[in-house]
């Protein structure tokens, strides 16, 4: 059987971050050491400091939440005061509770029972609040449960002042310049002025201007029909001046009685008067017309283009360029190469042939040949 070595078990110390032998004498010797005891005390102090910091943070957060709740409750009570309602939620008050005073708890319970009975008797008093959506619909909100509904709750009594001043009908202006009336509760719209319509003080000047413009439009429409009588014209002209005092909407009405047997002279005078009134009414309607954010319609007039030749005073370019045929006619110039002969290779005596010197070799040996060494 083969022999083998077995290593001793080791143990890791978390405080000192080192390995020691996993036996009783080694562990006891390490724990009795000064370094190990200092590390243990240091770890305990760190844990204590962390727990204190965590407790401080929790206390700070609880104080912040309490301040937020108090501010929210204060704002809620201010809203209730602004709406003219009584707050049913009491402010939170911190009072020390002791076991030596048992009758106070019973008295508080009796008061709470009485309040609950009162609330059951008058469930809608001071509980429901009426609101209006952005589209003009009315809804009712429960302050206690937070529920909302469209139907009016039983026993609900809103502010009498608000309901008296509240206007159901709203005056508007159509795209054609006619005024109409819109009911915010039922969604109904009509051209005739309702009986219970209450105009706003800020809307009076605009309504007068709209009525003046409507009166001028009605006059222009009535002038197109030749069957209108003189009495109607005077009534319409007088209506333009009196409309500013009393708001009314006039629509086009046809006269049943036709003046077929009138004289031609009176008809001419009537036509002249109608043309004059039309011109003045058109000018008034232009000035009193409601401004359109996209601009007004304009008639496009086509301009006749004249094809007359216009002298642009450009520089003349008659002799500036040469035609391509003239440029190609000359052709490319021919290149002539000259020949040169060498008469002599340099300064030398007459009658002596040129001598070419050979390259000297080192000790009579050629460099290109591989020479055998001296050892061989």
Swiss-Prot record:
This protein's record includes keyword Magnesium: no
Domain WW: 122-155, 163-196
Chain intervals for the UniProt region annotation (Interaction with SNRNP200): 357-375
InterPro entries: Matrin/U1-C_Znf_C2H2, Matrin/U1-like-C_Znf_C2H2, U1-CZ_Znf_C2H2, WBP4, WW_dom, WW_dom_sf, Znf_C2H2_sf
Effect noted on mutating residue 191 to A: Nearly abolishes activation of pre-mRNA splicing. Abolishes interaction with WBP11
GO cellular component: nuclear speck; nucleoplasm; nucleus; precatalytic spliceosome; U2-type precatalytic spliceosome
Positions with biased composition (Polar residues): 203-215, 316-326
Pfam families linked to this entry: WW, zf-U1
Single GO molecular function: zinc ion binding
PROSITE patterns cross-referenced by the UniProt entry: WW_DOMAIN_1 (PS01159), WW_DOMAIN_2 (PS50020), ZF_MATRIN (PS50171)
Family matches, as CDD domains: WW
Disordered, as annotated region: 94-128, 189-335, 356-376
Zinc finger (Matrin-type) in chain: 11-42
Record bears the keyword Manganese: no
Disease implicated: Neurodevelopmental disorder with hypotonia, feeding difficulties, facial dysmorphism, and brain abnormalities: An autosomal recessive, severe disorder apparent from infancy and characterized by global developmental delay, poor or absent speech, severe intellectual disability, hypotonia, and musculoskeletal and gastrointestinal abnormalities. Brain imaging shows aplasia or hypoplasia of corpus callosum in most patients.
PANTHER family linked: WW DOMAIN BINDING PROTEIN 4 (PTHR13173), WW DOMAIN-BINDING PROTEIN 4 (PTHR13173:SF10)
Function as written in the Swiss-Prot or TrEMBL entry: Involved in pre-mRNA splicing as a component of the spliceosome. May play a role in cross-intron bridging of U1 and U2 snRNPs in the mammalian A complex.
The protein's name: WW domain-binding protein 4
Species per Swiss-Prot/TrEMBL record: Homo sapiens (Human)
């Amino acid at each position: 059987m083969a022999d083998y070595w077995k290593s001793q078990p080791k143990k890791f110390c978390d405080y000192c971050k080192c390995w020691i032998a996993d036996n009783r004498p080694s562990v006891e010797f390490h724990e009795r050491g000064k370094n190990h005891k200092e590390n243990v005390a240091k770890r305990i102090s760190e844990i204590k400091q962390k727990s204190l910091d965590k407790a401080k943070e929790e206390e700070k957060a609880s104080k912040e939440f309490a301040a937020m709740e108090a501010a929210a409750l204060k704002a809620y009570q201010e809203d209730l005061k602004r709406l003219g309602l009584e707050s049913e939620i009491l402010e939170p008050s911190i009072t020390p509770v002791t076991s030596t005073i048992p009758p106070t708890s019973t008295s508080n319970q009796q008061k709470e029972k009485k309040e609950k009975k009162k609330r059951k008797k008058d469930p809608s008093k001071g509980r429901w609040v009426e609101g209006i959506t952005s589209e003009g619909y009315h809804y009712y909100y429960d302050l206690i449960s937070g529920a909302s509904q469209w139907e009016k709750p039983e026993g609900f009594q809103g502010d009498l002042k608000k309901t008296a001043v509240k206007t159901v009908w709203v005056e508007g202006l159509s795209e054609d310049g006619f005024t109409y009336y819109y009911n915010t509760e039922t969604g109904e719209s009509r051209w005739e002025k309702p009986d219970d319509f209450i105009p706003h003080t800020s809307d009076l000047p605009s309504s007068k201007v709209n009525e003046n413009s409507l009166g001028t439009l009605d006059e222009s429409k009535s002038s197109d029909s030749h069957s209108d009588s003189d009495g109607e014209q005077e009534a319409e002209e007088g209506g333009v001046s009196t409309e500013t005092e009393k708001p009314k909407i006039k629509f086009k009405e046809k006269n049943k009685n036709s003046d077929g047997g009138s004289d031609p002279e009176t008809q001419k005078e009537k036509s002249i008067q109608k043309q004059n009134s039309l011109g003045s009414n058109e000018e008034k309607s232009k000035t009193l017309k409601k401004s359109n954010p996209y601009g007004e319609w304009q008639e496009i007039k086509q301009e006749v283009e004249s094809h007359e030749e216009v002298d642009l005073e450009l520089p003349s370019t008659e002799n500036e360029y040469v035609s391509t045929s003239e440029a190609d006619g000359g052709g490319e110039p021919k290149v002539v190469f000259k020949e040169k002969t060498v008469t002599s290779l340099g300064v030398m005596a007459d009658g002596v042939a040129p001598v070419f010197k050979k390259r000297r070799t080192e000790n009579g040996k050629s460099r290109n040949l591989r020479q055998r060494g001296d050892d061989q």
